[in-house]
């Protein structure tokens, strides 16, 4: 290539074209280019010395030089036609890339999905290892660059399979990420022809040990001779463990007889773990040291339009992603779900090309299962003519039914306003598409959703009224004023409600009390966006209030109706826990009618089963309420009678005095995303920890909480596993604390559950999650997020059911 030559690009702002323009400029060539719009990509080229010409005009074509065009440039383009008239050399983008790579060690990445990420990861590793590679990548890095000419022999580039340009390349190293029904319109609709093209490309690699392919992709198996990578055991580069930790991935793999443990990747999603594995394989093949590989992956800054954050608000998150094929959409949403947990995901999808939508229609309908809501907007045609496809409204309806989400069609021009009206605090929005959907995120960069109106309900009719107030006073200080407008409701011991200005100690909560159905209270509750009950005992955490809020159609925090009711029934809890193999303390249930009719028979059965001391416990009260330690028959009979004053059901339980009390906290939805804390221990002065000692009432020293336990890792793992079993079998939703006894032999026995555990300053629930690295504010956020999720799931099922009924009726 003659360095005196001038290169003119028709469409210089395109991602592939601009990368090559960068390389030419870095190598000292003169470059000009035209495009319809000027953005950051062209600004970077101008800064290097390129001449930018807006729009397309015949006069832009130089008298001498080489004209570069891409597959997207139509043959009737005025500059293309003028170049033909002037008989100037016309070179396709792919041909220029092949020329630029001549006499260099070319590392080319091809495949239907993931090319940009894999090539970017390889580049990052080589840069960290000080190899200074050249690169041409289909996405902008953190410096807004996609092309660069380095000083070394290495040249890393994407090899686009979509337009037949693979024939121009002769790679030293090849990576094939996968093969899908993508770009089939360029292969006469034949996936087989696409596969043959990929196969021919890999055959150009002289050494099979320099050809890497995805061994989990069925379409590639048996076609390619090389090094397979993936999650299957038969892969030569075998990823044998992976997990996602928030916005990062951690994985381990084996390659060439060596294990590489706990690699930290600054990307999310199983698909990106596979992408990173391919990059690792290439790097190791070239002898790059493990330390450089690990550092590059850990600090990888990502690629723009790949899970890129677009907004500044801390109340919600707006991401942009290039995913536009159903497989990409599905993988992206799955990774996002694992990162954000129970937060509502709103996917804004702009289908890209009518032909892709037609070829992938069935997959498209099922691609959104990890979203909560989908906004479907108009197809970005990319120059194609419309095809015979269902209407946008019909597409949205089918997505709703197939992906089990609420999907709504919104015309492109209305999307921004629709989002402004519907985005809620804690939402995660993600735009999906390769067209101009990125404008939505730009428009919402500084948008702030309105704060949630949260009503804190506390007090209650139970004997734990005072503890509820203490818990509420502690929790409300962590309700962020940037996220929430908070109102306070106190229920007195008679069940009457009052709305108060604050929960300060010494406030008079009894001056203006109303029935919950009074207009004053009902109207105040109706205006709330969310209710946060912080109530202990009957009428608070037993499903009663939860049922009322369900009827009122209000989202609420803490346990669900069913979970509350079961958890506060200690007998039912024991039965369900035992059904999944969780050891429960031996017990014998007793009902009031049975006790009234046959007290002697009841006593005889108890004495035949248990020895003194034993415990009499109420079935539906708190963990330390209505619990009596008895030592003889007289005490037993008296305390059973007393227990029936507080509850309709009681049970006798074998004593576990001398055992340690180990407790574990839970938060989230047991059916999807939940968190289990590390165990803590509650220690009293002696024996059973009663209500007064538990909370330090009436002058008693409160029981102490020990977080750094003298327990083996095996025991800690065991109690957490038992906790998880209990939480899942009772379908935990919201929050709870699960209590166990640990006997002298090292056996754990389920004691009980507390669906709304104490949250006072000294209570362990908040501290349990704080010790996992959360702030108290984040924990309270999570209580609200879990409540919103619980409400959204029920609403989604209800709306889908009603819609399906309507469709059935119409048919």
Curated annotation (Swiss-Prot):
It comes from the Bacteria. This is Bifunctional enzyme MurC/Ddl. Its cofactor is Mg(2+); Mn(2+). It is found in: Cytoplasm. It catalyses: UDP-N-acetyl-alpha-D-muramate + L-alanine + ATP = UDP-N-acetyl-alpha-D-muramoyl-L-alanine + ADP + phosphate + H(+); 2 D-alanine + ATP = D-alanyl-D-alanine + ADP + phosphate + H(+). ATP binds at residues 111-117, 607-662. It comes from Chlamydia caviae (strain ATCC VR-813 / DSM 19441 / 03DC25 / GPIC). Binds 2 magnesium or manganese ions per subunit. The keyword Repeat does not apply. GO terms for biological process: cell division; cell wall organization; peptidoglycan biosynthetic process; regulation of cell shape. The keyword Phosphoprotein does not apply. Signal peptide: none annotated. Residues 574-785 form the ATP-grasp domain. Keywords: ATP-binding, Cell cycle, Cell division, Cell shape, Cell wall biogenesis/degradation, Cytoplasm, Ligase, Magnesium, Manganese, Metal-binding, Multifunctional enzyme, Nucleotide-binding, Peptidoglycan synthesis. Residues 1-450 are annotated as: UDP-N-acetylmuramate--alanine ligase. Mg(2+) 1 binds at residues 739, 752. Its EC number is 6.3.2.8, 6.3.2.4. Pfam families: Dala_Dala_lig_C, Dala_Dala_lig_N, Mur_ligase, Mur_ligase_C, Mur_ligase_M. Pathway: Cell wall biogenesis; peptidoglycan biosynthesis. PANTHER family: UDP-N-ACETYLMURAMATE--L-ALANINE LIGASE, UDP-N-ACETYLMURAMATE--L-ALANINE LIGASE-RELATED. One of its GO terms (cellular component) is cytoplasm. Residues 451-811 are annotated as: D-alanine--D-alanine ligase. The lineage of its organism: Bacteria, Pseudomonadati, Chlamydiota, Chlamydiia, Chlamydiales. SUPFAM superfamilies: Glutathione synthetase ATP-binding domain-like, MurCD N-terminal domain, MurD-like peptide ligases, catalytic domain, MurD-like peptide ligases, peptide-binding domain, PreATP-grasp domain. Gene3D superfamilies: 3.40.50.20, ATP-grasp fold, A domain, ATP-grasp fold, B domain, Mur ligase, C-terminal domain, Mur-like, catalytic domain, NAD(P)-binding Rossmann-like Domain.
């Amino acid at each position: 290539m003659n360095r005196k030559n001038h290169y003119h690009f028709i469409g210089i702002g395109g991602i592939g074209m601009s990368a090559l323009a960068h390389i030419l400029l870095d190598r000292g060539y003169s470059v000009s280019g035209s495009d319809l719009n000027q953005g950051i990509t062209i600004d970077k080229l101008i800064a290097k010395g390129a001449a930018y010409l807006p729009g397309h005009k015949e006069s832009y074509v130089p008298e001498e030089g080489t004209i570069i065009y891409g597959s997207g440039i139509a043959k009737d383009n005025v500059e293309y036609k003028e170049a033909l008239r002037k008989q100037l050399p016309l070179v396709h983008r792919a041909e220029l890339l092949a020329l630029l790579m001549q006499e260099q060690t070319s590392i080319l990445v091809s495949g239907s999905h993931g090319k940009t990420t894999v090539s970017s990861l390889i580049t990052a590793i080589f840069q960290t290892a000080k190899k200074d590679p050249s690169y041409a990548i289909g996405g902008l890095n953190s410096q807004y660059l996609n092309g660069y000419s380095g000083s070394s022999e290495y040249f890393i580039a994407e090899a686009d399979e979509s337009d037949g340009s693979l024939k121009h390349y002769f790679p030293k190293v090849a990576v094939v990420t996968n093969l899908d029904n993508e770009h089939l319109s360029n292969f006469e609709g034949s996936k087989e022809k696409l596969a043959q093209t990929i196969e021919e490309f890999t055959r150009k690699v002289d050494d099979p040990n320099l050809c890497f392919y995805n061994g989990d992709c069925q379409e590639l198996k048996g076609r390619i001779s090389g090094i397979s990578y993936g999650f299957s055991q038969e892969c030569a580069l075998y990823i044998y463990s992976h997990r996602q930790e928030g916005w990062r991935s951690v994985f381990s793999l084996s390659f060439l007889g060596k294990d590489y443990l706990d690699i930290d990747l600054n990307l999310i999603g199983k698909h990106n773990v596979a992408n990173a594995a391919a990059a690792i394989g290439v790097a190791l093949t070239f002898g790059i040291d493990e330390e450089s590989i690990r550092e590059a992956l850990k600090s990888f800054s990502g690629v723009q339009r790949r899970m890129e954050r677009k907004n500044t608000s801390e109340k919600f998150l707006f991401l942009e992603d290039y995913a536009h094929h159903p497989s990409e959409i599905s993988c992206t949403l799955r990774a996002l779900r694992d990162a954000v947990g129970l937060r509502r995901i709103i996917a804004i999808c702009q289908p890209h090309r009518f032909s892709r939508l037609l070829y992938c229609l069935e997959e498209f309908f099922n691609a959104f299962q990890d979203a909560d809501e989908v906004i479907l907007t108009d197809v970005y045609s990319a120059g194609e003519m419309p095809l015979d496809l269902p209407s946008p409204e019909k597409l949205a309806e089918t997505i709703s039914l197939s992906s089990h989400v609420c999907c709504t069609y919104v015309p492109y021009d209305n999307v921004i306003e629709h989002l402004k009206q519907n985005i809620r605090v804690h939402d995660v929005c993600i735009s999906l598409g390769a067209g101009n959907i990125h404008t939505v995120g730009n428009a919402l960069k500084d948008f702030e959703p309105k704060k949630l109106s949260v009503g804190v309900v506390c007090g209650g009719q139970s004997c734990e009224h005072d503890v509820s107030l203490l818990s509420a006073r502690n929790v409300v200080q962590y309700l962020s004023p940037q996220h929430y407008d908070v109102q306070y409701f106190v229920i007195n011991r008679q069940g009457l409600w009052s709305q108060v200005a604050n929960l300060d100690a010494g406030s008079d909560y009894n001056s203006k009390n109303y029935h919950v159905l009074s207009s004053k209270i009902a109207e105040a509750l109706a205006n709330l966006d969310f209710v946060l009950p912080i109530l202990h005992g009957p009428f608070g955490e037993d499903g009663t209030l939860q049922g009322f809020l369900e009827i009122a159609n209000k989202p609420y925090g803490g346990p669900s109706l069913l979970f509350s009711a079961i958890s506060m029934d200690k007998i039912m809890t024991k039965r369900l826990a035992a059904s999944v193999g969780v050891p429960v303390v031996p017990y014998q249930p007793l009902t009031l009618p049975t006790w009234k009719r046959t007290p002697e028979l009841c006593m005889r059965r108890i004495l035949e089963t248990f020895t003194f001391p034993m415990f009499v416990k109420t079935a539906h009260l708190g963990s330390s309420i209505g619990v009596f330690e008895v030592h003889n028959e007289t005490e037993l009979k008296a305390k059973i009678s007393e227990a029936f004053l507080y509850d309709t059901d009681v049970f006798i339980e074998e004593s576990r005095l001398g055992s340690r009390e180990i407790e574990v906290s839970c938060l989230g939805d047991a059916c999807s995303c939940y968190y289990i804390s590390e165990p803590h221990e509650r220690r009293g002065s002696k024996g059973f920890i009663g209500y007064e000692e538990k909370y330090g009432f009436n002058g008693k020293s409160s029981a102490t909480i020990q977080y750094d336990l003298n327990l083996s890792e095996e025991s800690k793992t065991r109690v957490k596993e038992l906790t998880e079993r209990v939480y899942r079998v009772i379908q935990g939703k919201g929050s709870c604390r699960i209590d166990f006894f640990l006997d002298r032999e090292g056996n754990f026995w389920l004691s009980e559950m507390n669906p709304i555990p104490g949250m006072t300053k000294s209570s362990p629930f908040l501290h349990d999650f704080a010790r996992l690295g959360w702030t108290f504010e984040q924990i309270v956020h999570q209580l609200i997020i879990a409540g919103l999720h619980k409400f959204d799931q029920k609403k989604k099922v209800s709306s889908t059911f009603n819609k399906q009924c309507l469709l059935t009726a119409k048919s």
